[in-house]
């Protein structure tokens, strides 16, 4: 069923081509009723909004933003144009690649053409963005980068470190390894029980660092023998994008 994003001010409800739930729920690491809901979706804007002077790339909205942080009833919405998403996915952006493998809440014949060909967007070099994001989360976990997340201060007080950052570190390393070995990302994650345990603080910081280091090494080793191509076929992606947009616009009233 197509989610109603018009209620949040989205102007192109009829142009949606797919939607999925992201965040901790997609990974299988949601803690009961404590997390908000993260919606991700793609749309093809009208020609004037993609080819004209006022070009659109995304739409974001949140019902949260309160001092105490998002609660279980809050919703975060992040919608990308198909063109913007494809550019991110072709570069190996982890969040963008998730769209190809996440359980769908809504799909279309347009998106089916992309989800049926995930290999177009996969390459050996994509291990780098995953490890880069994991390293970023580790530095934030250790206080070496950025400011502390004031909304998660309770986690640090209770466990001695931000366990959500720790969960993302291990998740990203594991996804990088699976992507290199098998050309896919399983969602929810096969080790979701482990990820939940990490969020609950069942692992020490030292154990997180050791596990992260091990998984990073395994991901790099998997890259060396990966069956994936060295680079994505940008011409094939561009052709698929052009065909999909022209077909969608020819059938659309927008």
Regions flagged by a language model, labelled:
Residues 1-106:
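An N-terminal structural lobe/cap that precedes and organizes the functional/catalytic core
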Residues 13, 152, 192-195:
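Intrinsically disordered, low-complexity regions
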Residues 47-50, 56, 158, 182-184, ...:
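Generic secondary-structure boundary/loop-capping signal
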